[in-house]
Amino acid sequence: MPLVNIKLAKPSLSKEQKAELIADITELLSTKYNKSKERVVVVLEDVENYDIGFGGESVEAIKAKASK
């Protein structure tokens, strides 16, 4: 059973976009790896900007600098 965990930085996708992403990932794994769609699990997690870092700085701090 494939399990795909995708983390998305907030602000995240809309409910409709998330549903489309889940359907697309499920279709990809089903087609490419011959897996039953019913066996594919997709988990989407929204992550706060202060919980993601690039180059030693949080995304929140990077965005704050860019907006000045």
Curated annotation (Swiss-Prot):
GO terms for molecular function: isomerase activity. The keyword Amino-acid biosynthesis does not apply. Its EC number is 5.3.2.-. InterPro entries: 4-OT-like_dom (IPR004370), Tautomerase/MIF_sf (IPR014347). This is Probable tautomerase Cj0270. Keywords: Isomerase. The lineage of its organism: Bacteria, Pseudomonadati, Campylobacterota, Epsilonproteobacteria, Campylobacterales. The active site is at P2 (proton acceptor). It comes from Campylobacter jejuni subsp. jejuni serotype O:2 (strain ATCC 700819 / NCTC 11168). Belongs to the 4-oxalocrotonate tautomerase family.
